[in-house]
Each structure stands twice: as structure tokens, then as C-alpha cells.
Amino acid sequence: MEESPLSRAPSRGGVNFLNVARTYIPNTKVECHYTLPPGTMPSASDWIGIFKVEAACVRDYHTFVWSSVPESTTDGSPIHTSVQFQASYLPKPGAQLYQFRYVNRQGQVCGQSPPFQFREPRPMDELVTLEEADGGSDILLVVPKATVLQNQLDESQQERNDLMQLKLQLEGQVTELRSRVQELERALATARQEHTELMEQYKGISRSHGEITEERDILSRQQGDHVARILELEDDIQTISEKVLTKEVELDRLRDTVKALTREQEKLLGQLKEVQADKEQSEAELQVAQQENHHLNLDLKEAKSWQEEQSAQAQRLKDKVAQMKDTLGQAQQRVAELEPLKEQLRGAQELAASSQQKATLLGEELASAAAARDRTIAELHRSRLEVAEVNGRLAELGLHLKEEKCQWSKERAGLLQSVEAEKDKILKLSAEILRLEKAVQEERTQNQVFKTELAREKDSSLVQLSESKRELTELRSALRVLQKEKEQLQEEKQELLEYMRKLEARLEKVADEKWNEDATTEDEEAAVGLSCPAALTDSEDESPEDMRLPPYGLCERGDPGSSPAGPREASPLVVISQPAPISPHLSGPAEDSSSDSEAEDEKSVLMAAVQSGGEEANLLLPELGSAFYDMASGFTVGTLSETSTGGPATPTWKECPICKERFPAESDKDALEDHMDGHFFFSTQDPFTFE
């Protein structure tokens, strides 16, 4: 902490010190409560010091403590905290004014408290005056401040307990609301999940419906293609059938032509065979003729010889050869005639071959056409089967589609209803959640208000508790002062008892001297009374015997044998009244000595203390003990006895000098002492009784 003049921070927005008392008791620790404004960041280097009011520098502190840094802070809210100053470091009591000052780590004063003093408590500070709440009476009650503070502390504690119970109830309600919100959120999540699953199912059904629709469209297109193909094939089949019919007609015509050509060829073949048979026969005949010619040549050769012989035969043969030549010519002519037939046959054969080839080609074309027709018919049959299958499948798909449409429409209606129900449920849940969130927000706000009030009440309770502790400390200090005063009174009591013992000794001495003097005077008067007894009767009331005290002592207990005339019970609440004057009974004769007058002075002092009935008697009579009681009661009893009997007699009862209550003479002395102790201030009971 560097030394620097006090730089006062502005009071607005600065540190605010709470419940600063005007006076503090020394030798007791002091608790300082303060509030940091919103936005202030507390630091461990900040400190709170006790300064004199006129201090102008931060180094002029009397003592200081480091500020406490809270663990958790809320942005935008003030910070309440406190520190304690130990009793050993506090200033000494006096009239000097002090104040708390908050100094930050830069050495700037951020706030200061009202001035206060350190001084010992005064006796009157312990009492406070209370007025009646209704104002119906003018009675003022004077009660100890500790009682009032204790009542206020009890009320604050009760209010704090009520607030804590209310806080616990609110926390329980908030917990229930949170659990309800969590259940609703879980239900909403489940509903959303179910809605998502239903939407996924709906999307799956939509996709399957789209796929089925696409497949149906594809099948419809395929069916259209197949129908178009079937129509094309039917047109092709019809065209091919027409072509086949045309080819069949042409083939039939060609067959007829082939048949005619075949018949003609057969005829030609028959003719050719006949011609060939004739040719072969002619050739055979030619060969036979050639052989015969050869034979003839041989025969000619033979016949040359035999020419002559056979010239005729040769002529014949020549004729026969000529005939044969004519036959051969005819055969050749016939062969020549057969050449056109051969050509015609060859042409017919070629035409038959070409017709056969054409028929073969037509047969092949017809076979290919038949195969194409069969193939087309088979393809048509297969197409018809496929179309039938496709139609069956389309019918099945149509039925399935209708069923799917029905089911889909039902599911869609159900899904729409469930979606609507879920939407309504979600809207209700959303409204419920909004309402619950609003209620939770209100509860949080109210809880925050309650927390703020509770914190404020806690701070005020802590401050009141601190004040109560301080008041209790003051009361303890006052109690110590009273104990010291009581010890002083005990010492004074001991001194008074010592003085009473001395006085008792002096009174015994004076009584003995007076008794001796009275005995001497009696003897002298008895001697004189023998001569004039009548004169004694006239002055009988004036004789010293009438005023002579009976034998007494400070520890006298009285003679037994008599019962009380009418004892009364002592009231616990007794008003001290002035007792009957005792001094007339104690007046002695005019011829008492100086010692007698001195004893009378001592007794007069004691009787005056009793007659005053004031605060001095209340304080002194209990300490005087049994000596004064015995003396006072002895005087009373003796005087009354002498008055009634005309001479000294044994007292039959004792009387309280304050309330005139009588006790038997044989009763214990402690009973009278306890009775008289009940009249005075210092007793075993509580000196104050408050309602």
C-alpha cells in the first residue's frame, strides 16, 4: 500500500456500508458489512480500514483487514460480504470518531461509512422505553435492550425460518415443476419421435407409392410398347400372310406348271427313252449291221471269191445294205427329227431345272416365310402370353395398387388424424410448456425476489445478530461492571459487618454500663422508696425501670412458649412502607451518661435508615444482617411487654419492623431474616418483572 492522499470515490455507485453502529464496545471483535455496486470486480488486494474521521491519507489507518472475495458472483447484481476486525487491534475507548473506508488496489477510497466511536457501555444504555401498541394507555415499559434485541432476533429468526420454509416449499414446487417439465419434455420428445417415425413411415409409404406409380407407369409404357409391337407384328403377320398367300398362289401356279412340265418332261423322257431305245436298237442294228457289214466285208472278201457266187448275194446284200442305209438314213432322219425334241427337252429340262430351282428358292423362301411366320406366330403367342402375363400382373398391380391406395388412404387418414392429434398435443404441450416456463420464470423471479429478500433478511439478520452479539457483549461488560460493583458492595458489606460487630461490642459495653448504672440507681431508689412509697407511684411511669431494655443480643432467638397472635403470609410483591417510629420507645431519662447518648445516636442512625424506607435501606439493610433485626425486634417486643405488664417480661413474639408481621419468639431467627430479605432489592429473584 503506497502512501497517497485520499482520493475519494463518488458516493453514487460506490461501496455501501450497512448497519454501522454509532458506538462499538472495545475489546470485542467488530463485524463490518458492506455491499459492492454492480459491475465492481472485487480483488484480494482490496482492503477495509478503520480511519479517523480527519485522516487525509490512506496510510493514516489505525488497522485494516483484506477484503473477502466471494466464490461466485452474478453479473449485474450487487455483492454482499463482510469482514471482521479482531478485538486486539481495535482503538481504545474515547471520544475520537472513526469510520470504515474501502480502499481498492490502486489506493483509491471507493466508499466510507458514517462515523462511530469506541466507548464503554453506560448503565442507562441497557434500558429502552416501549409504548403501548394500541395507544389506549399512557403506560411506559422500561425493559432491557437485550430483551428487546433478543425478541427482535427471535422474530427475525422466526421470519427467516418461515422464509426458509417458504423457500424450501418453493424449491419443492420448482423441483416438481421441473420434473413435470422434464416429463412433458420427455413426452414431447416421445411424441416428436413417434411423429418422426410416422413421418418416416409416411415418407416410406410415399416412396413406395411413388415407386409403385413409376413401376405402373413403366408397365403402362411397356404395355403400350407391347401393344404397339403387337399391332406392328399383327400388321407384319397380316402382310406376311398376304405375301404367303400370294406366294402360295404363285407356288400353286408354279406347282401346276411344274406338274405340267413334269408330265411333259415325263412324256419327253418317255419319247426320249423310246428314241434312245430306237437309237440303241438302231445302233444295235447298226452295230449288227456293221458287224454284218464287217461280216459282210469278210464275207465280201470271202465273197469276192465268192463274188461271182455271191454277186447275186452281194447284190442282195447291197440291196440290203442300201435298205439298211435307207433304214439308217431314216434312223438318222428320225434322229435329226429328234434333235429339236432334244433341244425342246433340254429347254424343258432347263425350264424344269430353273422351275425346280425357282421352286426350291420359293420353297426355301416359303420355308423361311413359314419359319418367320412360325417365329412370328410364336413371338406373337409369346407376346400374347407376355401381354396376358403383363395384363395379369397389371391387374394384380392394379388390385394391389387399389389395396395399397385404400390402405394408404386409410393410413394417410389415420396418419393425418394422428398428426393432427399430435399437432394438437404438441400445441397443448407447447402451451403447457410455455405456461410452465412462464410459471417457472415467475417462480424463478419470485424465487429470486425471495432469495434477494432472504439475502437482505439474512444480511439484516446477520447485522442484527452482530448487533445482538455486540449488545450481548455490552451486557456482559455491564454485567462485569455490576459484578465489580457487587464485589465492591460485598466489600462494603464486609466493612459494614465489621462495623456492626464493633458497634455490637460497643452496644454491649454501653448496655452493661447502663445496666450497672440502672442497678445502682434502683438500689438507691429502693432505699429511698422505703421512706416514701407513694411518691414512687406518682412517678412510676417516669422510672428508669419502665424504659429499661430487656437483656438482648445480636444473636437473640427469643424464648419459646407462646404462639403467634396472627401471622400473615409475606407477599412476593411488597410495597415498602415506612415502619412505626421506634425512637419514642428508645428515649431515655435525662440523667443518661455521655456513653448512653452515644449509643442512642448510633441507634438513631439505624432507625432513621429503617424509617426512610428508601434506596439506602434497600441497599444497607440486607448487609446489616441479623444484628439489626434482633435489635429492632428486641426493642419492639421489650417495649410492648413492659408497657403491658408494667415491668420487664419475657417477649412472647417478634415483629417485622417493616410490615409489622409477627413471629413467635421461639421460632427460628432465619425465618425472620428470610422474611425481611424478601422486602429488599437484592434478593434471589429477578429484580425486574416485565410483561
Curated annotation (Swiss-Prot):
One GO CC annotation: intracellular membrane-bounded organelle
Annotated spans, Disordered: 514-606
Regions crossing the membrane: none
Ranges for region p300 KIX-binding: 1-30
Coiled-coil intervals: 145-205, 232-339, 417-514
Zn finger intervals (UBZ1-type): 653-679
Entry's localization field: Cytoplasm; Nucleus
Gene3D superfamilies found in the cross-reference section: 2.60.40.2840, 6.20.250.40
Lineage: superkingdom: Eukaryota
Disulfide bonds listed in the record: none
Function description: Functions as a coactivator for aryl hydrocarbon and nuclear receptors (NR). Recruited to promoters through its contact with the N-terminal basic helix-loop-helix-Per-Arnt-Sim (PAS) domain of transcription factors or coactivators, such as NCOA2. During ER-activation acts synergistically in combination with other NCOA2-binding proteins, such as EP300, CREBBP and CARM1. Involved in the transcriptional activation of target genes in the Wnt/CTNNB1 pathway. Functions as a secondary coactivator in LEF1-mediated transcriptional activation via its interaction with CTNNB1.
Domain notes for this protein: The C-terminal activation region (AD) is used for downstream signaling. Seems to be essential for coactivator function with nuclear receptors and with the aryl hydrocarbon receptor.
Family assignment from sequence similarity: Belongs to the CALCOCO family.
Main location: cytoplasm
Region annotation N-terminal AD (CTNNB1 binding site): where it falls in the sequence: 1-190
GO biological process: nuclear receptor-mediated steroid hormone signaling pathway; positive regulation of DNA-templated transcription; positive regulation of gene expression; positive regulation of transcription by RNA polymerase II; signal transduction; Wnt signaling pathway
Keyword Glycosyltransferase: no
Binding site for Zn(2+): C656, C659, H675, H679
Name of the protein this chain belongs to: Calcium-binding and coiled-coil domain-containing protein 1
Quaternary structure and partners: Part of a calphoglin complex consisting of CALCOCO1, PPA1 and PGM. Interacts with the bHLH-PAS domains of GRIP1, AHR and ARNT. Interacts with CTNNB1 via both its N- and C-terminal regions. Interacts with EP300. Interacts with CCAR1 (via N-terminus) and GATA1.
